[in-house]
Amino acid sequence: MEATKKLNGKAVGKWLSNNAIIMMMLAITLIVGIIHPNFFSGTNMINLFKNVSIRYIIALGISGCLITTGNDLSAGRLAGFAACLACIFAQTEGASGKFYPNMPTLSTPVVFILVIAICAIVGLCNGLVVSYLKVQPFIATLGMQQVVYGICLVYTGGTPIGSLNKNFTSLASNTIIGVPVLIWIALIVAGCFWFLYNKTRHGK
């Protein structure tokens, strides 16, 4: 009986140790909810999940690096670079100040494919530097962070990018069954990563 209690105590202690951050976040959420009852309102929860969804997708991308004891400091800058590219490709035809005046208005899926392909090349460069040149991930991605930031500034000239395709901008406001599209995208990406990590040889 005592051995069982000790085993259960160790299991509980190990679980709490492995999930300390989650427990702390839940505790903070409960405290904020008690202080501000409107915090748990449906509207606020939807807005909260909508704002977190983009960061959640970035975190999922970095999770693979962390699982393999690596890191990726360039993810934040790369997300900003992706946003700049997406806005440039999503500009409407004939818009004033258009980066590529002769380029027709691209559909949203085409914009996504182009941006993902370009950012994948940057990620491939990170992987090659770490794997073949044996540079520490911290150093390699820190350098890539600055490179991406510099390219973004030079490419856009620090100017605002406007006149975007309405089908592209509607992603931030449209809903499906009352749930914002951004949240659905985050859930789909999360499902893909779950499948990768749990059902594929590479993930396991």
Residue map of PLM features:
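Alpha-helical transmembrane segments within multi-pass membrane transporters and channels
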Residues: 94-145
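Membrane-interface helix caps of multi-pass small-molecule transporters
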Residues: 64, 88, 121-132, 155, ...
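Transmembrane helix-bundle core of multi-pass membrane transporters
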Residues: 133, 137-202
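Single transmembrane alpha-helix segments in multi-pass membrane proteins
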Residues: 31-35, 39-93, 128-135
